[in-house]
């Protein structure tokens, strides 16, 4: 009977493991461009919505308050420019 010797690792090979290169299926440029457009539209719509809600809930009141402090009374806001009141003859 013959004795067979097995060589487990070849002597001339590098023993480090190099995984095979896997190429991912590349998406078409039109799909990536469409995705960027969708993201841009979503960001724009959300920012416009936030600004609209901020204006209706908060900023409009702040603008009216600023105008009221600048003028004499809050009733003068809707009537535009009113003449200055004379301090010598106060009104009724």
From Swiss-Prot:
Gene Ontology terms: biological process: transport of virus in host, cell to cell
InterPro entries: Gemini_mov (IPR002621)
Main location: host cell
Keywords: Host membrane, Membrane, Transmembrane, Transmembrane helix, Transport, Viral movement protein
Extent of the signal sequence: none
Any Pfam family the entry gives: Gemini_mov
Chain ranges passing through the membrane: 38-58
GO CC annotation terms, alphabetical: host cell membrane; membrane
Membrane-protein topology: Single-pass membrane protein
Phenotype upon changing residue 56 to S: In strain: Mild
Function: Involved in the viral transport within, and between cells.
Similarity field: Belongs to the mastrevirus movement protein family.
Protein name (Swiss-Prot/TrEMBL): Movement protein
